[in-house]
Amino acid sequence: MAKKNKNVLVRLVSTAGTGVFWVKKRNPRTQTEKLSFRKYDKVVRKHVLFKEEKIK
């Protein structure tokens, strides 16, 4: 049998309020703080800050 994966999937939601999101894997044991990336938002056609939210 395969080992149980310890990584958690999280949504990175755009702070521009467009509803665009990226999905990333995060290991909660090694990365204790919330993720935030500056990535491209297709709706506003700019790089904006994306912050972590839980996947529902």
Curated annotation (Swiss-Prot):
Keywords: Ribonucleoprotein, Ribosomal protein
GO biological process assignments: translation
InterPro entries on file: Ribosomal_bL33 (IPR001705), Ribosomal_bL33_CS (IPR018264), Ribosomal_bL33_sf (IPR038584), Ribosomal_zn-bd (IPR011332)
GO molecular function, one term: structural constituent of ribosome
One Gene Ontology cellular component annotation held by this UniProt entry: large ribosomal subunit
Disulphide-bridged cysteine pairs: none
A Pfam family hit: Ribosomal_L33
Similarity field: Belongs to the bacterial ribosomal protein bL33 family.
Name of the featured protein: Large ribosomal subunit protein bL33
